[in-house]
From Swiss-Prot:
Catalyzes the isomerization between 2-isopropylmalate and 3-isopropylmalate, via the formation of 2-isopropylmaleate. HAMAP family: LeuD_type1. It catalyses: (2R,3S)-3-isopropylmalate = (2S)-2-isopropylmalate. Keywords: Amino-acid biosynthesis, Branched-chain amino acid biosynthesis, Leucine biosynthesis, Lyase. The gene is leuD. NCBIfam families: leuD, PRK01641.1. GO terms for biological process: L-leucine biosynthetic process. Its EC number is 4.2.1.33. It comes from the Bacteria. InterPro entries: 3-IsopropMal_deHydase_ssu, Aconitase/3IPM_dehydase_swvl, AconitaseA/IPMdHydase_ssu_swvl, IPMI_Swivel, LeuD. This is 3-isopropylmalate dehydratase small subunit. The keyword Transmembrane does not apply. Heterodimer of LeuC and LeuD.
Amino acid sequence: MTPFTRHTGLVAPLDRANVDTDQIIPKQFLKSIKRTGFGPNLFDEWRYLDIGEPGRDNSTRPLNPEFVLNFPRYQGASVLLARENFGCGSSREHAPWALDEYGFRTVIAPSFADIFYNNSFKNGLLPIVLAEAQVDALFEQCLTTEGYQLTVDLAAQRVRRPDGVEYGFDIDAFRKHCLLNGLDDIGLTLQDADAIGRFEQGHRARQPWLFGALQ
């Protein structure tokens, strides 16, 4: 998992509340358990004017010119600005996979659905909760300023606007540690690889009959 320390990126404003996981990545794309291939279908039913299907060449599909991520000014955005209850609906890890693969490193909103919030940390996507008034101010600046960027400093737990105004945000210390060091569940386990190896050796020595079929 890519570490997240400090990131400055172009902001895309998704001015919709209660965006659910089926809107983030529609159900027909959930057949795969691989973590790749979902970025092109992020917000599929909003980005395109037709119905998407797995394996289809998206480069030939008609784009929805009224959807924010299709606006030229937001191409290459890596910070998603959203409204309350982002990521609600069914539990699907594919949602943060799609956001991450599209290029978003962080999502800023007044609130998130609990399961989406937890899944985001496990996949290297930083969900930041700010006060609604602060999010409103960011929307206003983003919508009126082309090329609007924000800087997110995870170590300092601050979001800095182009005018120098900063907002602090809370994050669990363990989740912060994992993101700063690029540790997912597998990475955390591998930190104890030596201890696991010693246990396996001792276990095999104490109960060799359990491993007979593996000889």
